[in-house]
């Protein structure tokens, strides 16, 4: 909805009421743990990516009021947005390792952290994002492509050895490009495009050793 407004799309009778209804739910439930973007098995946790997404929900609602003149409790939403950000910085940031973590209290990283700049949580070249990308590269790059997270940590009960998840590598391309690493972005983008099948589609994962697509086809994340 926010993207549509910025492109000049007109509000209809349902767009803002729908967003207000969604904000009511988010306001009442944002502090609850969940299973994260990857629907990880096991106990629910406070995933950093999930917290950033609710931060983004409040940020978009605030902007809808202040930039587009819609009616809503922007000051209250701003207080909650700031509270969420404080929690992320206190519990989702590992100062010793210099990286945001997969979930609060975790020592691992997650490729979904690459979406933090995409929703405006911080700039792509922010020092915290740059060091988080470095941690992601160290821990999740496998044959030059990104894993979602390390399954060998036992966080979800899956066996080690998951193939790289292609959408995550495209997120890395965007991060490289938006933070000024254009050469790295071009190299990785060209490699990813080379994996497309005869009708130009990509699967969920890629088996580098077997040089084949694996998982759900097409990938539509």
Residue ranges and their predicted role:
Residues 1-88, 110-115, 212-213:
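The feature captures the catalytic groove of carbohydrate-active enzymes
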Residues 45-68, 164, 175-192, 221:
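Extended amphipathic alpha-helical segments enriched in small hydrophobics
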């Amino acid at each position: 909805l926010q993207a549509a407004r910025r492109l000049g799309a007109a509000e209809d009778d349902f767009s803002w009421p729908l967003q207000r209804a969604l904000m009511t739910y988010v306001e009442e439930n944002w502090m609850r743990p969940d299973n994260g973007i990857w629907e990880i098995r096991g106990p629910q946790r406070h995933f950093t990516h999930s917290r950033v997404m609710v931060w983004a929900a409040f940020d978009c609602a605030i902007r809808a009021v202040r930039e587009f003149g819609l009616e809503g409790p922007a000051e209250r939403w701003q207080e909650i947005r700031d509270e969420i950000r404080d929690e992320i910085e206190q519990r989702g940031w590992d100062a010793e390792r210099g990286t945001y973590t997969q979930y609060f209290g975790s020592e691992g990283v997650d490729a979904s952290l690459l979406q933090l700049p995409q929703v405006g949580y911080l700039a792509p070249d922010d020092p915290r994002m740059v060091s988080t990308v470095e941690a992601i590269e160290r821990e999740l790059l496998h044959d030059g492509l990104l894993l979602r997270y390390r399954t060998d940590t036992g966080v979800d009960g899956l066996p080690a050895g998951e193939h790289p998840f292609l959408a995550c590598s495209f997120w890395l391309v965007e991060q490289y490009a938006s933070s000024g690493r254009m050469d790295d972005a071009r190299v990785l983008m060209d490699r990813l495009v080379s994996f497309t099948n005869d009708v130009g589609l990509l699967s969920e994962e890629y088996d580098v050793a077997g040089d084949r697509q694996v998982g759900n086809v097409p990938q539509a994340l």
